[in-house]
């Protein structure tokens, strides 16, 4: 039997949450409020669902390898050439391809901490050295990250809004940091939650002004298409072209592309989701204040809050009451939990369950 690569042996596998059906069966629950994975409670656009159904008639054929129609649609939306766009099986594939193509064993990769685990995962998979830079006041410490990158980093990952904090940094601060980052360092800005963010930030100008900047986005969040696995990267063609060498030509299925095209055209669905999220966050903030709990104001569709006690205990107490959230011990925040903004009824049930859970202590 062949031996496993050293880098893989050292890694801890990512453990996804249990399927809702399994949790319901184990706990005898019939109605579980799922607020643990930052999904859109409104679901996908009805137009996206209809487009996917129509595309079912062609599932016997292979999809077009580069998702040309979706790239062209995104090019119109961004006002950039189509060859600046790479369509992936979720934005995770974009991260993985960047690591596979640009990293050698021992290369340095700078990541924020706490943040999305995929950055560390793809770096460690390639045997890279991960340099984690702690947040400062719940947001990215851009000067410290630029300083770390200046010491020979191949990749620098940023997340805006950050997961799990929901915080953002100013465009001017990022530009100042980019001036200190070597041109040989690829700076990947993960914008999975960008469509929820109401602060000014010109991603298009950044990728135009800095040849080493990559923007990553997903259809999983505001577009409600997590199950389709669809995302994209925006970058200079000279950065993008080598990724096709390592990319599976059929990693993105035709149903996802059809749904993505329709989702981009349903502006009303996006606006309804934004309004629901805005109102839901205000409701949750007020509830946390009444309960005397600290929380981090968020530009995403979730809120990080301090339970004032071990998060695992609160998680279990909420789960017994039919509410599933995300304990943040894996992020290095043992007393914090992250809750997705749901529908008004889901938010109400969460708050009622949280009151009862805190009353147990």
Swiss-Prot record:
GO terms for molecular function: histidinol-phosphate transaminase activity; pyridoxal phosphate binding. The keyword Disulfide bond does not apply. Keywords: Amino-acid biosynthesis, Aminotransferase, Histidine biosynthesis, Pyridoxal phosphate, Transferase. One of its GO terms (biological process) is L-histidine biosynthetic process. Signal peptide: none annotated. InterPro entries: Aminotransferase_I/II_large, HisP_aminotrans, HistidinolP_aminotransfase, PyrdxlP-dep_Trfase, PyrdxlP-dep_Trfase_major, PyrdxlP-dep_Trfase_small. Pathway: Amino-acid biosynthesis; L-histidine biosynthesis; L-histidine from 5-phospho-alpha-D-ribose 1-diphosphate: step 7/9. It catalyses: L-histidinol phosphate + 2-oxoglutarate = 3-(imidazol-4-yl)-2-oxopropyl phosphate + L-glutamate. Its EC number is 2.6.1.9. The keyword Isomerase does not apply. Its cofactor is pyridoxal 5'-phosphate. The modification N6-(pyridoxal phosphate)lysine is found at residue 221. Coiled coil: none annotated. Homodimer. Belongs to the class-II pyridoxal-phosphate-dependent aminotransferase family. Histidinol-phosphate aminotransferase subfamily. This is Histidinol-phosphate aminotransferase.
């Amino acid at each position: 039997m062949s031996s496993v690569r050293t880098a893989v042996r050292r890694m801890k596998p990512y453990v996804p949450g249990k399927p809702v059906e399994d949790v319901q069966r184990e706990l005898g629950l019939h109605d579980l409020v799922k607020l643990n994975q930052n999904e859109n409670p409104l679901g996908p656009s009805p137009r996206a669902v209809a487009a996917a159904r129509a595309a079912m008639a062609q599932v016997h054929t292979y999809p077009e390898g580069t998702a040309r129609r979706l790239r062209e649609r995104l090019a119109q939306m961004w006002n950039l050439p189509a060859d600046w766009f790479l369509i992936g099986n979720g934005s995770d594939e974009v991260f993985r391809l960047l690591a596979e193509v640009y990293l050698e064993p021992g290369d340095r990769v700078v990541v924020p901490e706490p943040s999305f685990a995929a950055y560390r995962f793809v770096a460690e998979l390639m045997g890279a050295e991960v340099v984690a830079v702690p947040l400062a006041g719940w947001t990215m410490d851009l000067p410290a990250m630029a300083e770390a990158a200046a010491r020979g980093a191949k990749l620098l990952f940023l997340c805006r809004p950050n997961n799990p904090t929901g915080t953002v940094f100013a465009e001017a601060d990022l530009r100042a940091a980019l001036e200190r980052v070597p041109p040989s360092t690829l700076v990947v800005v993960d914008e999975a939650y960008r469509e929820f963010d109401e602060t000014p930030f010109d991603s298009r100008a950044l990728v135009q002004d800095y040849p080493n900047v990559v923007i990553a986005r997903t259809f999983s969040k505001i577009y409600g298409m997590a199950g389709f696995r669809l995302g994209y990267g925006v970058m200079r063609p000279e950065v993008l072209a080598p990724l096709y060498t390592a990319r599976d030509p059929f990693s993105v299925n035709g149903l996802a592309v059809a749904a993505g095209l329709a989702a981009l055209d349903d502006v009303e669905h996006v606006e309804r989701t934004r309004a629901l999220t805005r109102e839901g966050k205000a409701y949750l903030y007020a509830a946390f204040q009444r309960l005397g709990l600290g929380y981090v104001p968020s530009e995403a569709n979730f809120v990080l809050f301090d339970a004032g006690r071990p998060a695992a205990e609160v998680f279990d107490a909420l789960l017994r009451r039919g509410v599933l959230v995300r304990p943040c011990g894996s992020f290095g925040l043992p007393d914090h939990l992250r809750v997705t903004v749901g529908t008004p009824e889901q938010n109400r049930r969460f708050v009622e369950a949280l009151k009862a859970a805190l009353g147990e202590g």
